[in-house]
Amino acid sequence: MSSTVISLAHFCDKHGPRIISVTQSAEKGTLGEELLVPDYPTESYCESCLLQFPEESTRSMRCFIEDVPFITTQYSSIRYQLLNSIIKRAFSEETMIYDNMPFIFFDDLRGLNLVIGFKLYDENARGNERRYCFILTVDSRSHDDSMKMLSEHWNFIIGGFDKMIAYIKNIHKSEFLGKNKTVENNLETLNNNAFIGSYLRANKSKFGRNLVSLTDDKFLFVRIHKWNSFLLHTVMNENKLP
């Protein structure tokens, strides 16, 4: 099992910091069965923090790149406590911002973590915004080796996260405009400001919406799985961390 993991997390209005998806890899030549999760009840997840694949009964997604299995799940049964500790730290950081600016933290408990936050406008959310972040975790106690890996692949990793975030924001903007056809196409601040102008109706009841609904893309988490797998494979191919 690789020491490098990519997570997508969300600050849920109802549950606080929650992991939406985790992408990990297993040993080359195996099926990665230990990373799959069993069928589990989803009642403890609200609509905002639920991982939603096109087939509702699907709980895990797996692909192979050069015979290495990459698995995406709602949570990691192996790193459950670790990743929950990481997202709580990430969302509680005073430096946490949501304009795609990365920040890094490292300690012996959580390893090295690169966090990039972003937000999407949603009038049905508290504060009219939903907050997310992608996190690259290097689960290693070697600060020097982890930083070396990160510095060597900095532009690639940051660029990879930026591309996925830009895709999510763009299709979210298209979905928003599709439902608000009378709004002028001048929404550069759509996902950067919590307040979006006087044409939006206030005092609506708040309810949960996940990324599939916000983007109107039922294959979004499939795309995230494939993109994260590509990022992990590229980084892993050149680095072997203890």
UniProtKB/Swiss-Prot annotation:
It comes from the Eukaryota. InterPro entries: FLCN/SMCR8_DENN, Folliculin, Folliculin/SMCR8_longin. One of its GO terms (molecular function) is GTPase activator activity. One of its GO terms (biological process) is positive regulation of TORC1 signaling. Pfam families: Folliculin. Residues 48-212 form the uDENN FLCN/SMCR8-type domain. Disruption phenotype: Sensitive to high hydrostatic pressure (mechanical stress). One of its GO terms (cellular component) is vacuolar membrane. Required for the nitrogen-regulated transport of amino acid permeases GAP1 and PUT4 from the Golgi to the cell surface. Present with 656 molecules/cell in log phase SD medium. This is Protein LST7. It comes from Saccharomyces cerevisiae (strain ATCC 204508 / S288c).
